[in-house]
Amino acid sequence: MSGRTGERPFGDIVTSIRYWIIHTITVPMLFLAGWLFVSTGLAYDVFGTPRPNEYFDQARQGLPLVTDRYEGKQQIDEFTKGL
């Protein structure tokens, strides 16, 4: 047997003017904030990922692939030695 939770029905919320006034402002602002977060480079700094021009330096232009399962630790140490 189902009962009422006392919450407003979703249909009432979506059709209210207050809902649309609030969301026509907040949803575009969320997209704008996300775009600024990525375009300014702050996302790279916060999450510690390298920028697109920092993946490869002049000394190493190839991909650092681990090719041997049992010597993987040694290969990773060789890759990170120059960093």
Swiss-Prot record:
Gene name for this UniProt entry: psbE
Molecular-function GO term, any one: electron transfer activity
Cellular component GO terms held in the UniProt record: photosystem II reaction center; plasma membrane-derived thylakoid membrane
InterPro entries, per database record: PSII_cyt_b559_asu, PSII_cyt_b559_asu_sf, PSII_cyt_b559_CS, PSII_cyt_b559_N, PSII_cytb559_asu_lum
Similarity comment: family membership: Belongs to the PsbE/PsbF family.
PROSITE patterns: CYTOCHROME_B559
Binding partners and assembly: Heterodimer of an alpha subunit and a beta subunit. PSII is composed of 1 copy each of membrane proteins PsbA, PsbB, PsbC, PsbD, PsbE, PsbF, PsbH, PsbI, PsbJ, PsbK, PsbL, PsbM, PsbT, PsbX, PsbY, PsbZ, Psb30/Ycf12, peripheral proteins PsbO, CyanoQ (PsbQ), PsbU, PsbV and a large number of cofactors. It forms dimeric complexes.
Topology in the lipid bilayer: Single-pass membrane protein
General function of this protein: This b-type cytochrome is tightly associated with the reaction center of photosystem II (PSII). PSII is a light-driven water:plastoquinone oxidoreductase that uses light energy to abstract electrons from H(2)O, generating O(2) and a proton gradient subsequently used for ATP formation. It consists of a core antenna complex that captures photons, and an electron transfer chain that converts photonic excitation into a charge separation.
GO BP, sorted A to Z: photosynthetic electron transport chain
Residues that span the membrane, as ranges: 21-35
One Pfam family cited in the UniProt record for this chain: Cytochrom_B559
Compartments, as annotated in UniProt: Cellular thylakoid membrane
UniProt cofactor(s): heme b
Keywords, ordered alphabetically: Electron transport, Heme, Iron, Membrane, Metal-binding, Photosynthesis, Photosystem II, Thylakoid, Transmembrane, Transmembrane helix, Transport
Protein name (database record): Cytochrome b559 subunit alpha
Co-factor note (free text): With its partner (PsbF) binds heme. PSII binds additional chlorophylls, carotenoids and specific lipids.
